[in-house]
Amino acid sequence: MGSPGMVLGLLVQIWALQEASSLSVQQGPNLLQVRQGSQATLVCQVDQATAWERLRVKWTKDGAILCQPYITNGSLSLGVCGPQGRLSWQAPSHLTLQLDPVSLNHSGAYVCWAAVEIPELEEAEGNITRLFVDPDDPTQNRNRIASFPGFLFVLLGVGSMGVAAIVWGAWFWGRRSCQQRDSGNSPGNAFYSNVLYRPRGAPKKSEDCSGEGKDQRGQSIYSTSFPQPAPRQPHLASRPCPSPRPCPSPRPGHPVSMVRVSPRPSPTQQPRPKGFPKVGEE
């Protein structure tokens, strides 16, 4: 048998070989927060001291397997991993999971796992990457808040223009109404004019009061009104004047000529023609 020192040295060499051929997995980032509809990238780094021919990898979310492809001679056997997930391998040791676009269902804890099957079976698991998906975009919210004063300014401008238009319309309507009243178009501002018509020629002296009444009845009255005609008074026929008083004169204010009429002669006394002397006179 060998000495105890030789046995101890052999054990140390075997342990060193085992450590040199061990498999390690590092995962990042530990925490990732993105907005809904954007892109999320998770990285898994697989390290092994010795060369390997076949590597099996696996991604899980909250303990559920998303995908489990193989890597042989630097190529992936599967490029899809879960909903909206794509895998890519970059030699010698980088495995990337890309989620595009992310939704609220992508929030959770992601773990990368790797195993070497040839030449010997070895397994390793990475740390946890926690993914949080925000339903709203803080940047868009800030943009909405920043644009809100501008929107208020636009509303204020439109409201001012509307008020100005209403005031101008009221002023124009009032001015037009005043002009119509000043021009006499208002029903309360009517002008009336009475014209008394008298036929040419003076009446004969032999005509009695009844004849004058006929002349008065023959007189015409013209009335002009703007815009409404003046109400016409009922025409009153002149009554014959008793002898020997003359007929009453028309109302003052009307240019009517007055004719003096002598009393009506008796039946025995006939009117004498003008220009002949009386009996006994020469």
Swiss-Prot record:
Record-annotated Ig-like domain positions: 23-129
Bias (Pro residues) ranges: 241-253
Signal peptide: 1-22
Predominant localisation class: membrane
Sugar attachment sites: N73, N105, N127
Sequence ranges on the Cytoplasmic membrane side: 172-282
Tissue specificity as recorded in UniProt: Widely expressed, mainly by epithelial and endothelial cells, including bronchial epithelial cells of lung, breast glandular and lobular epithelia cells, urothelium of the bladder, skin epidermis, epithelium of gastrointestinal, rectum, endometrial glands of the uterus, ureter, fallopian tube epithelium, colonic epithelium, small bowl epithelium, stomach epithelium, including both chief and parietal cells, trophoblastic epithelium of placenta, and pancreatic acinar cells (at protein level). Consistently expressed in veins and arteries (at protein level).
Post-translational modifications: N-glycosylated.
GO cellular component, one term: plasma membrane
Pfam family, one: V-set
Basic and acidic residues biased stretches: 204-217
Gene3D superfamilies per record: Immunoglobulins (2.60.40.10)
Protein's membrane topology: Single-pass type I membrane protein
SUPFAM superfamilies hit by this protein: Immunoglobulin (SSF48726)
PANTHER family: B-CELL ANTIGEN RECEPTOR COMPLEX-ASSOCIATED PROTEIN, TRANSMEMBRANE AND IMMUNOGLOBULIN DOMAIN CONTAINING 2
Name of the featured protein: Transmembrane and immunoglobulin domain-containing protein 2
Organism: Homo sapiens (Human)
